[in-house]
Amino acid sequence: MNFPYRNIVVLTGAGISAESGIQTFRAQDGLWENHRIEDVATPEGFARDPDLVQDFYNQRRKKLQDPNIEPNAAHLALGRLEAELDGQVTIVTQNIDNLHERGGNKNIIHMHGELLKSRCSVSNQVIEETGDILTGDLCHCCQMPSQMRPHVVWFGEMPLRMGEIYSALETADLFISIGTSGVVYPAAGFVHDAKMHGAHTIEINLEPSAIESEFVEKRYGKASVEVPKLVEELLAHLESNVENA
């Protein structure tokens, strides 16, 4: 690695939050918490059975606020990296939880939305939401009050803040992917974009992802072990550069 890095982009997926007790979508059988994805994570599913979809996310929202769900060592290490790096750290997460915020990160892009927010299905106005959203809960920001929905990007919808993400990738000198499968686009293409602009690339995963060949460096193991080790290396080189200045 060419130390020190000043513009780091970190892409995180379900693998980083799994160790905190957040259950993930099982790609092998297409189920999420025993529900079919098309039933609970698509606009069509919401139109077909809004009560089912609202209840599904209400349960996920309750689970996220369980006192036993806490940031793990990987989240805390990334928070430390942002706080101590002499430069920019951008967290681009596919996760809808708030564990990066609770781990200390501030510069976070939630490309798939946030579970603790809701939005108007017409105007897209977003509000904080810690309780249940029910069918019949209306947003009064519009001329015609409209149904509130989870602030979550469903399959078939456009991810959020893509312009900001691509701008960060253009200036990144280090791109790290943590806990991602490498099968969901556009996120799976970020490593290629970062490489095209000259960034060093690192994959941290339990096992090789579908795009592992795109990465220059690979580290396999638990995120709670591998991420703190990498952050220690990055900050140690930063300190040595300061001492030698």
Swiss-Prot record:
Catalytic activity from the UniProt record: N(6)-acetyl-L-lysyl-[protein] + NAD(+) + H2O = 2''-O-acetyl-ADP-D-ribose + nicotinamide + L-lysyl-[protein]; N(6)-succinyl-L-lysyl-[protein] + NAD(+) + H2O = 2''-O-succinyl-ADP-D-ribose + nicotinamide + L-lysyl-[protein]
Pfam families: SIR2
UniProt: substrate binding residues: Y57, R60
Active site per UniProt: H112 (proton acceptor)
Molecular function GO labels: histone deacetylase activity, NAD-dependent; NAD+ binding; protein-malonyllysine demalonylase activity; protein-succinyllysine desuccinylase activity; zinc ion binding
Cellular compartments annotated: Cytoplasm
Enzyme Commission code: 2.3.1.286
Domain Deacetylase sirtuin-type: 1-237
Superkingdom: Bacteria
GO cellular component: cytoplasm
SUPFAM superfamilies the UniProt entry points to: DHS-like NAD/FAD-binding domain
Sites where the protein binds NAD(+): 13-32, 94-97, 179-181, 205-207, 223
Tagged with keyword Transferase: yes
Principal cellular location given in the protein's record: cytoplasm
Ligand binding (Zn(2+)): C120, C139
Cofactor(s) it depends on: Zn(2+)
Role played: NAD-dependent lysine deacetylase and desuccinylase that specifically removes acetyl and succinyl groups on target proteins. Modulates the activities of several proteins which are inactive in their acylated form.
Stored NCBIfam families: PRK00481.1-5
Stored PANTHER family: NAD-DEPENDENT PROTEIN DEACYLASE, NAD-DEPENDENT PROTEIN DEACYLASE SIRTUIN-5, MITOCHONDRIAL-RELATED
Sequence similarity: Belongs to the sirtuin family. Class III subfamily.
Protein name: NAD-dependent protein deacylase
Organism from which the protein derives: Vibrio vulnificus (strain YJ016)
